[in-house]
C-alpha cells in the first residue's frame, strides 16, 4: 500500500491557522492532511480574508470555517470552544500565520524596529493549547 492510499490521519481532526491562497504553505499542508484522511477546520482574520479562505477551505471539504484574530485572546478562546463544541476535541493545530509591518520590511532585517519585532513574534507564536 502506498502512503497516498494509507489514510494515516483518518478520524483525526485539526485546525489550520494562516491559509491565505493556493501559494500558502498552509495550503500545501492542508492538501496533504486531507489526502491522509484528516477532517479540517480553517480560520480567517476578517470578512475580507474570509472571501479568499472560504472557497479554498470548502474545496477541501472543511467542516468548520471560523473567524479568528490571533492577536485577540477572546477570538482564540472562542475558536477553540467552537471546535470543542463541534468535534469534542482536537488532534492537531497547524499555525501558519505570519505578519510583519511593511515599514520593517523596507530595510535590512537587523534594522527591524523593536515594536515591529514584537508584533511579528506575537502573531507568529501566540496559539496555545
What are these regions (language model features)?
Residues 6-42:
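Canonical Rossmann dinucleotide-binding motif of NAD(H)/NADP(H)-dependent dehydrogenases/reductases
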Residues 13-15, 93-98:
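Conserved hydrophobic beta-strands of the Rossmann-like cofactor-binding core
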Residues 24-25, 50, 101-104:
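Glycine/Thr-rich phosphate-binding loops of Rossmann-like dinucleotide-binding domains
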Residues 36-54:
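Conserved glycine-rich Rossmann-like NAD(P)H-binding loop of the short-chain dehydrogenase/reductase
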Residues 57, 68, 72-77, 81-86, ...:
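Conserved mid-core segment of classical short-chain dehydrogenase/reductases
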Residues 62, 89-90, 117:
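Local beta-strand N-terminus motif with an aromatic residue
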Residues 127-129:
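Conserved small/polar residues in nucleotide/adenosyl-binding loops
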Amino acid at each position: 500500500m502506498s502512503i497516498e492510499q494509507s489514510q494515516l490521519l483518518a478520524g483525526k481532526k485539526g485546525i489550520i491557522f494562516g491559509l491565505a491562497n493556493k501559494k500558502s504553505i498552509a495550503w500545501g499542508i492542508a492538501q496533504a492532511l486531507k489526502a491522509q484522511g484528516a477532517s479540517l477546520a480553517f480560520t480567517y482574520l476578517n470578512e475580507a480574508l474570509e472571501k479568499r479562505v472560504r472557497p479554498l477551505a470548502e474545496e477541501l471539504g472543511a467542516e468548520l470555517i471560523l473567524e479568528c484574530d490571533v492577536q485577540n485572546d477572546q477570538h482564540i478562546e472562542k475558536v477553540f470552544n467552537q471546535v470543542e463544541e463541534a468535534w469534542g476535541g482536537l488532534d492537531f493545530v497547524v499555525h501558519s500565520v505570519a505578519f510583519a509591518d511593511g515599514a520593517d520590511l523596507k530595510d535590512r532585517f537587523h534594522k527591524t524596529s523593536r515594536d515591529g519585532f514584537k508584533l511579528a513574534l506575537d502573531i507568529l507564536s501566540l496559539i496555545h493549547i
